[in-house]
């Protein structure tokens, strides 16, 4: 457990450095939210209706933007080989790296959501509801994205390949995240059903993601 804690702290420190990826994701999220009101126009009701979808889409794209460095940097400097040969199971190491990625890249987006939601004409209860759905759903984006990041490393491809692999897996999270947000804000549909499915997607990805990523890395590093 001490080794996993050290790995999490190391990845968070690297991500928070200039050029480490976390700041890039937050700035991209901020850019998406700030530019959308100019694209939508002066219709504040339309902007508020689109607000949850804009916030969720920004979070998805920001997460995708930073996923390519999840394993690639360690692969380039040889750290990934040491992690694979360590006594700690590779599945737990993958889970620790995904957790560090979420803490450095996903959690800041959730914290910023209540403030940025005001730019989309959402009131405080509405932005709080969106932040709650992001808290439940963004782990699924990270842990499913980890599978694509591992495949991109083993196939020595990044960028477009990662997007092609991850986006289909992220669509259900996006659908139920937006549905839960809209149900909490406007109704009349129940908030509980889509939110429960969103939590279930995160739990399933939490279990399946590390094992799938570890299998991919083992085959790629052999």
Regions found by a protein language model. Name each.
Residues 1-25:
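Aromatic- and glycine-rich beta-strand/loop motifs that create alpha-glucan
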